[in-house]
């Protein structure tokens, strides 16, 4: 994985969150200031809000990541770390990684990114100046929904030495041998699987975009994506995750998901099975406003089933709206 990410060293962990929290604790200390994108993986913000702030007296500034002026203003306050995800959770917004990395180097801020949904096949943040890359190996790297693990990669040997000898050892988030073997197995087919995932997802996204019952589609591969210039600059391909909003109520959107037959219901994507869910329909209005997303947002993951079968399943669910 270090070689695929063009890093000098990698460290594997027992979960993605074990990797994430180890990176944060390696860079930060009590009283540190952290900058975090608003739409990162929800457990990351819960870790910051429920542990780092109350127990370590850390300060956290949330930013969109797209407003470089906002990012620079936050960095001027003396931050230790900026936490990124691009494309980000829920609506797959991308941020200009090189521009942010350049600002971070200017102000002495470390940068960390969750690169899980891109994998090293489609995006290499270290080449753009990002300091630490994390992958949840439970997703595409594992590829079969039978593995929990995480990995950190960096070009900074001293930082990786600290993460391995201190954070991983002290917190005990060490990957088991069976999980390591499963991750190696997954890496052997990663490229082939991603090519199929991407091809299927493109067909599904274009199908959704043309459907008059769909209000909005969020997918980095669509030609209509307003962030296309940034996407083409830093990505070599596209995830098979996407989200969309129906021109319908929350209840109708729930029924739409329940009427799907081939798509399973679940959140831990990355395996062979296509999945659908409404990740935020029980969220507070405050949470929705914070992340700037719709309650009835539907996220789907395109697995390895035939594209024509997935389209047929979506079509029959639309017909029952």
Whereabouts are the PLM-identified features?
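A common structural junction motif
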Residues: 171, 260-268, 317-321
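Acidic-histidine catalytic/liganding microenvironments
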Residues: 4, 208-212, 260
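Conserved PLP-enzyme active-site core in the AAT-like
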Residues: 9-213, 218
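Short amphipathic alpha-helical segments
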Residues: 8, 148, 183-186, 238-242, ...
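PLP-dependent enzyme catalytic core of the Aspartate aminotransferase-like
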Residues: 49-50, 73, 77, 193, ...
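Conserved C-terminal alpha-helix-loop-beta "cap" of PLP-dependent enzymes
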Residues: 214-298, 302
